[in-house]
Amino acid sequence: MAYSYTEKKRIRKDFSKLPDVMDVPYLLAIQLDSYREFLQAGATKEQFRDIGLHAAFKSVFPIISYSGNAALEYVGYRLGEPAFDVKECVLRGVTFAVPLRVKVRLIIFDRESSNKAIKDIKEQEVYMGEIPLMTENGTFIINGTERVIVSQLHRSPGVFFDHDRGKTHSSGKLLYSARIIPYRGSWLDFEFDPKDCVFVRIDRRRKLPASVLLRALGYSTEEILNAFYATNVFHIKGETLNLELVPQRLRGEVASIDIKDGSGKVIVEQGRRITARHINQLEKAGVSQLEVPFDYLIGRTIAKAIVHPATGEIIAECNTELTLDLLAKVAKAQVVRIETLYTNDIDCGPFISDTLKIDNTSNQLEALVEIYRMMRPGEPPTKEAAETLFGNLFFSAERYDLSAVGRMKFNRRIGRTEIEGPGVLSKEDIIDVLKTLVDIRNGKGIVDDIDHLGNRRVRCVGEMAENQFRVGLVRVERAVKERLSMAESEGLMPQDLINAKPVAAAIKEFFGSSQLSQFMDQNNPLSEITHKRRVSALGPGGLTRERAGFEVRDVHPTHYGRVCPIETPEGPNIGLINSLATYARTNKYGFLESPYRVVKDSLVTDEIVFLSAIEEADHVIAQASATLNEKGQLVDELVAVRHLNEFTVKAPEDVTLMDVSPKQVVSVAASLIPFLEHDDANRALMGSNMQRQAVPTLRADKPLVGTGMERNVARDSGVCVVARRGGVIDSVDASRVVVRVADDEVETGEAGVDIYNLTKYTRSNQNTCINQRPLVSKGDVVARGDILADGPSTDMGELALGQNMRVAFMPWNGFNFEDSICLSERVVQEDRFTTIHIQELTCVARDTKLGPEEITADIPNVGEAALNKLDEAGIVYVGAEVQAGDILVGKVTPKGETQLTPEEKLLRAIFGEKASDVKDTSLRVPTGTKGTVIDVQVFTRDGVERDSRALSIEKMQLDQIRKDLNEEFRIVEGATFERLRAALVGAKAEGGPALKKGTEITDDYLDGLERGQWFKLRMADDALNEQLEKAQAYISDRRQLLDDKFEDKKRKLQQGDDLAPGVLKIVKVYLAIKRRIQPGDKMAGRHGNKGVVSVIMPVEDMPHDANGTPVDIVLNPLGVPSRMNVGQILETHLGLAAKGLGEKINRMLEEQRKVAELRKFLHEIYNEIGGREENLDELGDNEILALAKNLRGGVPMATPVFDGAKEREIKAMLKLADLPESGQMRLFDGRTGNQFERPTTVGYMYMLKLNHLVDDKMHARSTGSYSLVTQQPLGGKAQFGGQRFGEMEVWALEAYGAAYTLQEMLTVKSDDVNGRTKMYKNIVDGDHRMEAGMPESFNVLIKEIRSLGIDIELETE
């Protein structure tokens, strides 16, 4: 394989044994593809597909007026250009969106003409609000903050059959039910009651017999019975009764008479039970009629009304039970034929027949009225109202839609072959659902499993945005209908009809405040990717935490390869929020699919198919780790497989599919845990969750022991700068990389220059620091997709969340009791876990009633010292080191005339000066914060004069833009002249500056000319003259284009900012805060092994080995056995080997060994011990040296999940590094110098510092705010609250009998208002006595008792 620019600089030793059949897909595809389909940007009218915005418009338009004389049709739409780019939107706090313009056609019909002749057509583009655009990383910028729309896992539309698990009725009888769930519209439920009658509910309302619904559909009793039951036909001839025999129906019955064949031979004797053997004999004998006694009919139900043959009078209605009296009537009337329903107790129950018996309605109208009463109780029903309501419930496309998914699921479930059909229900649909439900009750068929991923589908961003958009359009439709009637009389245009506000509001509400639109988790690249790949069962139309039971949250067999069984939050959301598996994707219906390799006759092919949970059920699927021979055939006698959602073993020839990779089961975060297969699942869950909380360290350090997924995550997360096209690095500095694109990738007529501006020290959503560092040097050749610059938490294009630390597992003076972590001071000195946090502080100057607030350095009653960090505009300068309480932005607010104190009156009388009428409301650094000002932004309202600071910032930005554009022009110009030089040198000239006719042009001549003079050359070859003219035109066009671009940017910068009403100016100050690691910070490994730093010890006190190398971290060995995450120990061993090999390479370099020796040693590491072989021969000697230099700190290794390093390979690596194979060594106590009793496990573990820092949690209250009602101090750091002295603490003081302490706690330290004021004064005066008064909460108690109407008085003694 060819190595990329960064890969060949540091190759990871890969221990995987299984071949890569399929690359890991682009990890953000689920977000980007979904929204791309929603927008269909750039599609022409013909190319529009029936999805997304287009589908929403088509479903609402055409809108026809109430009179029918005017219609508004939809023609198409187009999206404009965004006003600001992503970075500008974040800075200005606006939404990154594009205007949507819709072309509509207003048609007015001629009233007079009978055939609706068209009188007038008007077409116009109408502005329909802004649609947020997705950034290239799958996020949205809404009001300046980066947000993610999480996909939702909801119940698929369709029909579901279920039972109550015996919980409803005391007997434990299973009551079956069916539910038709549409994509939008009313739910329809059918359910059995304990008496085996079928009922129907619409939208979970009161239940009605199911036959009421069937009657409302227009079915008569007889048609209903015919639909559900077969009939037995009896012929009466005089005194004999003959049954038309269907032998199968006799099965299981007891013969009431001898059953004989045609020859009189008895087949079944009277009193015997009829078996399958008897039925076979009857069929063979061809018995078609059976004589039965008359009482055989008693208790049977009539299927067709019995009519008197002579008079036509109805003797018995259908669905009546035959009794002796009825039989007598029938005999008297000489009826010759009776049809009865065929029912039995085993597989054909009389459920529908029984339901009809309890149904009070007898015709369609009564049934409709009954339904109307149930839906609209209390309203008087009319025939029209009842018909309209019923028609709109399930049969109107506007109110009801199953959607393509729903129709597909519906048809499949009730056994139809076609999967397409209308979105509304039909009579047949309802009958088929009832038939299936009755069949399930009869024991034919099974109920559905609602947690099966074939019954749950994923709604992605695009679909949810489309639904919201449709909601907005429906609101618009109502208003348009009203106005359409006026359109013709008043000559209105489409623009006057459509008010786009409801659409814009619906979209804004969805992106701004929907439960699934979340503030992006931006701690590190992994947390960004995981957030975008999250699938939530919560949200609108989903579950709620309280209602979700255990089953929904549990891991289901169909999760395999679709949803990660490990990664889910701990706490109330466990199992409701999941993460997509690595290779999973959604199909066109929204069901999750997983890829498999096709297996034919036990030969594994390279063909890959994606299957949903339903499609895979019938397949026999082998695991990715199944043993294959060289030809790719399965060799084991029995292969471990999945079949029908069960894990079993089968013969190789039965296998039809095979997993593509062992990591297809888990999510991205879980696949980053090395030796995951050796960790307990609970700890792996914590491990994958805690990696998302790692704070990017100052210097990222790649993991020595990784899994090989690190590069994919870093590349796909979008935090790195990836080359869009290949080429040569033209120039590079800390803030930009300029690439001159290779000729074969340049499109005609464009510059062939890619400028990548790097993000420097920017604040993330979690206040961590986003900073990019270039990896390339001038002159380097890069290919498309190579990584040009590292972002936060990435090291040479690999994800690097933490640091490799030398750890020892041993108890140490109790400092690592209960998961505490003991650190060496060296870790702090080397800034291994130092992180930078950036805080944004905002100062807003408003227009108040008393006058405008002013941002100024002239602040009353503030000394010089406090102002020495401000410039003349009153804003802190960049680079200032500030402490808590320092002024960042000086601001004064006018205050009203106040009563003057006597002193002020005196001063005013003496000096005659008016005391300042403004108060100081400056922005100060919050308590507990100190840092460096790294950036200041000033936003000024239109029409408000800009201060000097705003102008200098603007000038800086313009200079930067100008520099960019000049650079681009310089390269374009250079490239053009290079091409010209190649063409001109050696060609003959007709004339030119200081040139004779017919002279050959040389390099020296061209070098002596100014570039502008080149175009004055006249060449003998006309083609060259044409080339010169084209080049001149191209360069001047380019110059003009870049000047226009500059003017455009300049206009944007100089226009006033769109600020909230009443705001004149906003100043944003960005503080960079450096946080070193300290006791109280939380740290963790990748295996769920978390702990809190308890102590930082001097280096000389830490345990060290025989060479004198001290360890960095001492961990408690008791944290491993009970938690069963042994992966951390294996990681430690392999990490030791990796580091040892690095040191060995380092020694070879220092001894300046030959390259051949280095190559040989590298070959031993990469190709002789297990795993994948690396092709080191394709690297030149210089590249081998560069690789060796990068491996000095340790040889990075990859042990992919479920396919990682084996124990023997770890031992071989340790041996190669000249280290003990046990991974243990003798340590010495740094304090005493004595050797410890036993060998200790020492090695390198990858440790993370989590975003739970003691600085953010530590808090102490002096005097602060009090709660309004109880007058007690508030709680929590955000409110500057106190420590709660709760019920249990009171018990403790009571137990000690500490009466005075208790009194102080309950009064002056809490809510005795007068007492605490007096106490404060006393302490100021140096008097430490206290007088306790009445606590405010006691007054509250009295008031509450009085509110109950109880008169209560306090008596004074």
Swiss-Prot record:
GO terms for biological process: DNA-templated transcription. Pfam families: RNA_pol_Rpb2_1, RNA_pol_Rpb2_2, RNA_pol_Rpb2_3, RNA_pol_Rpb2_45, RNA_pol_Rpb2_6, RNA_pol_Rpb2_7. Its EC number is 2.7.7.6. One of its GO terms (molecular function) is DNA binding. GO terms for cellular component: DNA-directed RNA polymerase complex. The keyword Transcription applies. Keywords: DNA-directed RNA polymerase, Nucleotidyltransferase, Transcription, Transferase. It catalyses: RNA(n) + a ribonucleoside 5'-triphosphate = RNA(n+1) + diphosphate. Belongs to the RNA polymerase beta chain family. DNA-dependent RNA polymerase catalyzes the transcription of DNA into RNA using the four ribonucleoside triphosphates as substrates. The RNAP catalytic core consists of 2 alpha, 1 beta, 1 beta' and 1 omega subunit. When a sigma factor is associated with the core the holoenzyme is formed, which can initiate transcription. This is DNA-directed RNA polymerase subunit beta. It comes from Pseudomonas aeruginosa (strain LESB58).
